[in-house]
């Protein structure tokens, strides 16, 4: 890994199978002398929800509406919404220009804390859903559509429409 101006260049990468995440990351850091390099790991067991919102809502009202939709989902599932860390991505709905499509992602706060604590001696800077981060591996073009398939224990199919993540499908083995 090297830095040229404001860009970070990854000169090599690979796949490592592991039983213990902490030991594996320590080994990779040692092998690559990457002691000062920020680390990003994949989120696991995240929950995806999709909401359609009226496009004319203000940002404040949109945020409240998304929160309300998630709380309703949690109520239906018997979940406490306070145990989740949530983020969302908003894109245009190509089928209905009056609506926005919201991809809402929720992860258990306790599991996030466990991962953060396990890697606290390293330079962990982010925990990201692989389905969203994987889009950074390709250069998208306007008006082009893409499907990215990531095959692991859980297979994810990320649909990109016109440079925006539109949908994420997950399939268990």
Where are these regions (language model features)?
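A short alpha->loop->secondary-structure connector
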Residues: 7-10, 56-62, 120-125
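Phosphate/pyrophosphate-binding loops at sites that engage ATP/ADP/AMP, CoA/4′-phosphopantetheine
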Residues: 27-38, 74-79
């Amino acid at each position: 890994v090297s830095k040229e101006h404001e860009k970070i260049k990854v000169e090599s990468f690979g796949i490592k199978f592991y039983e213990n995440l902490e030991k594996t990351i320590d080994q990779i850091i040692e092998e690559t002398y990457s002691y000062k390099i920020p680390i990003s790991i994949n989120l696991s067991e995240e929950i995806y929800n999709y909401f359609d919102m009226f496009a004319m809502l203000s940002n404040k009202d949109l945020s409240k509406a998304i929160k309300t939709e998630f709380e309703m989902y949690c109520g239906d599932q018997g979940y406490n919404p306070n145990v989740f860390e949530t983020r969302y991505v908003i894109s245009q709905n190509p089928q209905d220009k009056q609506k926005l499509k919201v991809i809402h992602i929720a992860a258990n706060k306790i599991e996030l804390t466990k991962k953060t604590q396990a890697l606290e001696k390293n330079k962990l800077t982010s925990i990201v859903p692989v389905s969203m981060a994987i889009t950074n591996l390709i250069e998208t073009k306007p008006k082009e559509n893409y499907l990215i398939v990531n095959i692991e224990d859980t297979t994810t199919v990320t649909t990109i429409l016109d440079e925006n993540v539109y949908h994420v499908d997950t399939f268990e083995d």
